[in-house]
Structure formats: structure tokens, C-alpha cells
């Protein structure tokens, strides 16, 4: 989605105090800022969910156009081969400050932060307001998301934890619920549930539009994992990855010892094979 983002502006105001955002994603780069969700009000970015240049996840809320409150994880997220699941649950009506914003990653609530701040009780956030909501790029800045996204949900008026959208399998691995049960509310939505569909697939009709670029459907998704090339492993420059790191192109002359390596689904025992299509790049 590096050159692509999605946009929607609600036609009416929903619940700005209580909401939940859930998304599955795979990032392709480290050391750069990736915007997952961005909402802008009155010329200022007032809400952002993103990775910092240090690969920490930041869930930021801004009020009054100056400063802000937010959660910045201690954890660093540098895996470019696996799918992540994030849930951001906000309810500013709660009496306890730490209950007003909660962050879940791969099923676990994050409670240790390098920086933390919580909104005032009953504060109105920008979410579910009649301003632009972007997925995959900042409203106020650039910072595009370079990676894949799948099964994106927003609720209006209801909070959920991660178990509404995922569950642990018999091996203790967090996996997706492809048809989660939740109440979307008036401005809630479900998009990118089946491939690259940005038509709302909840009980509403809160469709998104393509802000720029082209959406590309990939077979690698949160419910159908594919082996991908390792974006961190090229032994020479000029390797260009695309289509969810399932396609690689090398420009110029390839010398002995120059390569890029696969990263996922590489068994060390048993019988297996690799299938690839080799084409001449014009």
C-alpha cells in the first residue's frame, strides 16, 4: 500500500468517546514511519495509529491542536514476514484513566509503554466525527504504510478486546476470526475482508474510496499465509520487491553470490517443494 491509501468522511457524527479499531497487517520495511489509521480535524492531525522510525507502535490522540496523549510501546516490531493484529479500544467515559485507551497486539493487551498518556474523561476524539478518516497514510503528513492490510473493522459506540477479532489455536498461535461478531454502530465498518474490497461488508454501507494508487489483491493474507521473500536479506542493491514481497525483480547484472532469500514457510525436514514463475522483465 506504499502508494495507496483509503479514505472516507462520515456524513453524520457518531460516538466520538467510545469505539474500537481492529486491523491485520504485514509491514515490509523497518526504520520508517508507517501510518495505519489517521483522522484529521480542524487542520490538525488529531488521531494516529502508526509505527515510529524506531519500529515502536504509537497510538496517539491529539486535543486542541497542541500536544497530545498516546501510547508508545516498549516492544519493537521488525518482523517483515509475519502478520500482525492490532486492536485499539477507546472509551473516554471510563473513570480510570488507563481504561480509556487500550492497545492489543496479537491477542495480548500491551501494558508496558515507553511513553503513556490518556485522554481526559469524556473527551471527544476525532474518530466517528464528520472529518476525513484515512487508512494507509497520514492526513496531515505523508508517511504511507508500506505493506499489506486485511480485515479492517471500526465500531461506533462499543468497545471490544482482541478476542472479538481473533483467537488462539491449539498450538497457542493467534489467528484471525474471518467472520467476527460485533456491533458496528452507525459509522462502523468492515473492509478488506475478501481480497481488496473497500465496499463496507458490515451491516452498514460505509464504503471507502481509493485516495490514490491501485489496490492489489495478494494470495498472502491473514487467513492464508504464503511464503515471501525476505526484504532484509538482499546481498546486493537493486532488488525490487512487490505484490506483498511475493515478487522480486533485479535490475542490472547479477553477479555470483548476489541473492535474496525466502523467509517464511521454510521447513527443515520432510518432503517439500518450491514453485515459482520466472519471467523476463522488460
Model-based region annotation:
Residues 223-282:
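Conserved, ordered domain cores of eukaryotic regulatory proteins
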Residues 1-5, 95-97, 102, 111-117, ...:
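Extended recognition patches within non-cytosolic domains
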Residues 3-58, 94-97, 158-163, 266-268, ...:
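Extracellular glycan-recognition modules
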Residues 1-3, 22-30, 48-121:
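Extracellular glycan-interaction surfaces
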Residues 125-149:
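Extracellular glycan-interaction patches encoded by glycine-rich segments
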Residues 21-27, 86-88, 135, 149-154, ...:
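Short hydrophobic/aromatic patches on beta-strands that form ligand-binding or substrate-lining surfaces
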Residues 1-18, 69-78, 138-141, 176-182, ...:
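Short surface loop/edge beta-strand patches of beta-sandwich-type extracellular domains
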Residues 7-9, 38-40, 47-52, 58-62, ...:
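Beta-strand-rich, repetitive solenoid scaffolds
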